[in-house]
Amino acid sequence: HVDGLAHLRRREDLPDMARLTFEAPAPPARFIAPKGSVTLDGVSLTVNTVERNAFSVLIIPHTLGVTTIGGLREGDAVNLEVDQMARYAARLMETR
């Protein structure tokens, strides 16, 4: 299910990929970790970096071309789903 909306804060188009930096709402942001997974508008991606509520992903040209991710511009909102395993781990730690 969708956990919230993330907003594209920065898009860097590089020769062999694009780096997209999003800002996540506070509640689900705590479940986002480097090398973890997020789903943006139904596209499952690996998180590259995390800083506070911001996170970045690296997108290859093929993915940019065949998904809605390629058309995103700064300020656009996307549906955000966080890694379910991160939720389970957090819940386990809370109940200890």
Predicted regions and their residues:
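Conserved loop->alpha-helix
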Residues: H1-R96
